[in-house]
Each structure stands twice: as C-alpha cells, then as structure tokens.
Amino acid sequence: MKIHTTEALMKAEISRRSLMKTSALGSLALASSAFTLPFSQMVRAAEAPVEEKAVWSSCTVNCGSRCLLRLHVKDDTVYWVESDTTGDDVYGNHQVRACLRGRSIRRRMNHPDRLKYPMKRVGKRGEGKFERISWDEALDTISDNLRRILKDYGNEAVHVLYGTGVDGGNITNSNVPYRLMNSCGGFLSRYGSYSTAQISAAMSYMFGANDGNSPDDIANTKLVVMFGNNPAETRMSGGGVTYYVEQARERSNARMIVIDPRYNDTAAGREDEWLPIRPGTDGALACAIAWVLITENMVDQPFLDKYCVGYDEKTLPANAPRNAHYKAYILGEGPDGIAKTPEWAAKITSIPAEKIIQLAREIGSAKPAYICQGWGPQRHSNGEQTSRAIAMLSVLTGNVGINGGNSGVREGSWDLGVEWFPMLENPVKTQISVFTWTDAIDHGKEMTATRDGVRGKEKLDVPIKFLWCYASNTLINQHGDINHTHEVLQDDSKCEMIVGIDHFMTASAKYCDILLPDQMPTEQEDLISHESAGNMGYVILAQPATSAKFERKPIYWMLSEVAKRLGPDVYQTFTEGRSQHEWIKYLHAKTKERNPEMPDYEEMKTTGIFKKKCPEEHYVAFRAFREDPQANPLKTPSGKIEIYSERLAKIADTWELKKDEIIHPLPAYTPGFDGWDDPLRKTYPLQLTGFHYKARTHSSYGNIDVLQQACPQEVWINPIDAQARGIRHGDTVRVFNNNGEMLIAAKVTPRILPGVTAIGQGAWLKADMFGDRVDHGGSINILTSHRPSPLAKGNPSHSNLVQIEKV
C-alpha cells in the first residue's frame, strides 16, 4: 500500500498486515513535519460544528462499587466513556476508576433493545406479548388498581419486590416505590437481602451487627485468610476492594490463603495458598481449626473471658444446659459427643487433616490475622451456621476490634455520611423474608411467624395482590426455582397487578402487566454515595448526559404522577413540593453540612466527585467495644459477643422446622439440605454452586455483546468429572435436576474441585416456558430451589445437586 498524500492517507483502508508493512512510513510520519496532526484541511467549511460536551456520572448497579464516569456526548449520544481522571491517584486518595462493565455503559444507554414506550400485557405472563399505550392510560391503570387493592385487601397486600438494577442510586434507587407506598398507608415490607440474608441474620445474634474492618487495614496484618471471598470479580474496580487488598498487601507483605471451591480471580497468582473445599462445608473446617487452637492453647483466653458469652462453662448463661458451651462442643464433650478434629473435618471438606492443622497454626500464631468471608459461604442452606462458625475464628484469636484484625465477616468500609432520599416511616409493621414473596403470593394467608419467619404478627392476613417491580430481574431470573415461580405468576387471580419499571425487556419484564420505560441513572441528575470504598469515602454529583429519548421517564416523575392520581395529600407527602432537581440540591446541602469541605453544588457539577479519607486512617469494626465494653456494649442482650445465644436456643425450641433444618445456639457445623452428604447425591452426584461473574453485576450488563464475547457463559467442571462423562472443553452439555434443566457449554478446568461444578449467576433466561422449559441462556435459577434457609428464610442458591451429560 503506497500513500503519497494526506488525503489518500485519510481515505485509505488499513489492515493489520498493511499497517505492519508500512511501519517504516508510520515512523517517518511521526518524525517529519510534512504530516501535522490533526489534518485540519480535511474539515469542510460548509459543515456546521457538532456540539460536544462531557459530564460526570456514575455506574450504579449492585456490585458494591459506585465508580465515577466521564461521559463524552456528541449529537445527544454518548460516544466515549472515561472514568476518574481527577487528583493525583495516590494510595489513600486514589482515582475511582470503573471496570469494563462501567466503561461499556454507552452500549447499555444506546442499546437498540431498550424499552421506549409504556406498554400493557396482552398475552400470558411470560410470553412477552405487549401493546403500546399512552402514559395516561398506564398511570391511570396503575393508580386505579392500586386504589382498588388497597380498598379491598388493605396495605399488607402490596409489596415492593427486591431489585438492585439501580441499587447505587439515591433518588434513582430501586427502593423509591417505598416512599410512594409509605405516603399512602404503607405496604408489606421485607427483611434481609438476596446478597446477605443468612450472614446478616447470624451476625445480629453474635455481634449485634454485621460489620468488618476496611480492607486497607490489611496493611497492618500478618495473615489474610479469605473464606469464599472474591473481590477481584465482585468488586474489581477503583470503587471496590481489589485495589485496597493489592496495595495494603504490598505494605504488609501479609501471607494470603484463599479457601474456595474454585480457584477464583482473587487468587489468580496473588495467593500464597489455595485450599479447595466442598461447598457448604466451611463451617466444618472452622470447627476443626478451633479444635487445634483449643487443644494447642492458642486461643486468646483473656479476650474470651472479658468480651464473650458462652465460650466455656464460666461464661455460659445460667439457663443453658451443662456442657452446652462452645469449648465442650468442639472437644466432643457436648451433647453430640463428636470431637471436631481435623480428621473429622477432612472427610467432610476434602481438605487433608495435615493442611487443616497447618492452617490452624498459622491463624493462631499470626498476630494479628485478617480473617474474612465473602457472601458465598452464607448463601447456602446452612449459611447462618457457616457464617457464625467462620467468625468464631476471629473471636477465638482475639482479632476483633483491633487494627490488622477483623470480625471474621466481609470487609467493611468507612462512611462519610451522604444524605439519602428519605423513604418515610412505614405504618405497616408486618414483614416477610426477602426470599418468601412467592409463598406470600401463592398461600400468604397460611404463612406464620414460627414456620415462615413472618415478623410483626403471628400470621399474614392477606396474600400479595399488587407487586412493584422496579429495576428488578428478581421476578423470574434472579429468584430460586424458575419453574415454580413461573407457575405461581401464571395465575393472575393471585397477584392481580404486577407493575414493571425497567430499561430492557428482561426475563422478568415479560411477566409484568404494565411495563414502563425508565430513564437510566446516566440520563438523570443524582447524588451518588460510595459503598465498598475502604477508608476513602466519596460522593458523586451525577448530571444527565443526554436528553430523554422516545417516551422514557424518570422514576421520580412516574411515582409523582401516580401519587397525584391517588390524591393531593399523597402527592404532597411524596414530593414535599420538590422537583427531582430540588431534591438533589437538598440532599447535597445536607451532605455538605456533615462535610463542610465538600464543594458547593455548582462547583461540584464541574469537579464531579468529592473524596474524604477516614479520620482514623483505617476503619476498625467494633473498636469502641474493644476499648471499653462497658461504655460501648454491643447490640446483643448481654452487650457482649454471644458465642452461645439464648435467643437462638429459644427459636430452635419453638419454631416449626424440618428434620434437616437446624438452628443452633452455638456456631456449630450443620450439613444443611441439598449439600455434599444429602442422599439425593445418589441421583444427582455433582454439587453445583453459583458465583458472581465479572461479565455482569447479577443480570445487569447481561445483554452487552462485547462482555458476552469476553466472558462466555459456561459450566465449570473438573477434568476428572468431565472425563468420566466423555465431556471435552467447549462441548454442549445438559445440566439437570428435579427443578429444571439447561443446555450450556462446558468449561473443563482444574480450577474447580472434583465433584463440584459452578455456573456464574445472572445470565438471562432463554427458555420456552410454555414448551419444554429447557434454558439455553445459562440462568442458574432454573436449577436452584425456592426452599428458604432455616433462620433467615434466605436464598440457599449455592446448595444444589445436579447431573451433567454430554449432548
């Protein structure tokens, strides 16, 4: 390819081969003044200048990070995405750079499949048959049905479905329908979350809260032990945790041990040791480590005596049975008579006894040790017990409330105190678990406090009749047992109205009766708070990048219009006379009151972000309690760490539980259902666990082509299990159990334990739900259960048994 003029250069078709051949020309061009950049003579005088601008915004999906985005706009379209370019990017004041998901956000904004107009369902729920309607018809239909259901059934018949598609927003948050319902008498609310149901419940009984040291405190530790914790995929960006783990370990040179069924991306050469473990057996490992710590006199006895209840006989509550304390349980002197030795745990976990002993000695001798757990181990049928058992290792070694230690839960972060859009008080005090909403639709009047975890009263009076589904794929895709959920939603005499508000025709959107097109947070103004941000808090003032397209509207406008139709009092209570812009200015002003050094509103529109470091350098959970337990008691009945919980002992005695549902007053190991030793393994021999895939945040970004190509949806299977089934890497396989089946590509890899398989959660369901119901999209919930865990009544979505066959 010969090029002699600048015009020819501008018009030439360049391939990689031709570029390599002409590399000498390229070097000459850069060295010569004959070719100057830009080629300004190519601009035609008749062309009008194109208006360009750049605004600050944020990615607000539910990864736990809230990354700064610089959106470059031309012709009212985002064409280029930068991230944080502010400041000097030094440790402690680093740039909040987005991951590849956030950097691909223009592909979401400009996606051809975005919802454009209000629609109403004209086919069966799940068929995806809709017709376009006007905004007035949509809002009138919603308001009329809501008014009717409130009159006929009462406020407990209305529920706001769990959703996290815009979880990081403030006035664009998934929970904004709360405020509308609280403006007109309240609604049946929920407790817990799909992320942390089991661990949040368990830690409330143990510590009175679920809180951990910030990850930057790893700079002060000697050892990092991660149970099922994978921030390199779940919180990989500058607004997340991976940066802190890397930087802090460079300063402490701490040894890092990763315990996970998969060799995950957080390990990936960073770890000093990977211990693969059977899913759901982390509690057995923790108990065996405790056995070594106790028998080798490596526990912090003064800490246990001063700060804890129930470690041994002298701190056991007076009403507890003799030998009901933790030490007796571990040594085999309790009711079960089983010593929790490394040999005992090796048969359960698949980790050799000598490795367990080595790990225990490392934990016992490292002063301090940063022991943490992700949210994967607790997302099992025995998750409440597992999370307590792991946290006990921090308690036994006295690592709670100190620098370089941790409480044994997932890492925490410091909060600078962003003012949140107030949701108002809910007059309805009845609650259900976040995971039991399908039961509340199907047989709500039968749900009780002692069997189903109903709170606020002994039983539900009415089933759910009206469902708000905002930025939520939980309606079908993200909820356990898709086939069961499909059946429940088919009968529209049960839940009479489902209102969906979304950006795309997701699997869940197909089940809505009225479907409204939402503007994305990047198309609106909002005040965005950090979340998993270590010891550096920050707040982002997001500005709309583009004008509204088609008939998309902001959530605040939609709900204001519904409130207006419900009456002037409801409208006034919901809006307080403020527009969305006025609310943002109000929230900014309240945040600035707590942080006087924060720029004023107009200046922050230019700067985009305000960063502030924790005044104590590192955030330490329960520091005040450790320093003075009398003045700063925990929020437990005793004010101390409750190793033995009298409240849990009472619940275990009074709740209706099945034989394989165990609630224990101690952090004891319990197998759970659908686990490694379930008799069902004779039919379905492989354990299946989910994981948070870097290509998506749950199901958000699940329809972005470049991310799908970079990270294909596959089932992980060990070469030993694959060979036994004649499966090769890339083969299409059938994964199935009693709940459902899917066809998916096999990823044959030694990065997963034999006997265990894994599928990244959040892939969009692609199944003919009125035909064979075989999923071709890789949605793990076609295989999971809708049976809740014993205590939290949470989602046990990692406890699954399957078989895999080559197609």
Language-model segments: residues:
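A glycine-rich phosphate-binding loop feature that marks nucleotide/adenosyl-phosphate handling sites
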Residues: 306-309, 363, 406-417, 575-590, ...
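Phosphate/diphosphate-binding loops
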Residues: 496-497, 544-563
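Long, well-ordered, tryptophan-enriched scaffold segments
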Residues: 262-366
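N-terminal export/assembly segments and adjacent metallocofactor-ligating motifs
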Residues: 2-298, 324, 343, 465, ...
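Long, contiguous, secondary-structure-rich segments that constitute the structural scaffold
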Residues: 555-607, 699-701, 705-716, 720-807
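Extended redox/cofactor-interaction regions of prokaryotic respiratory oxidoreductases
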Residues: 2-3, 174-259, 266, 284, ...
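Short beta-alpha connecting loops at secondary-structure transitions
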Residues: 271-277, 537-548
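Active-site phosphate/pyrophosphate-binding segments
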Residues: 322-441
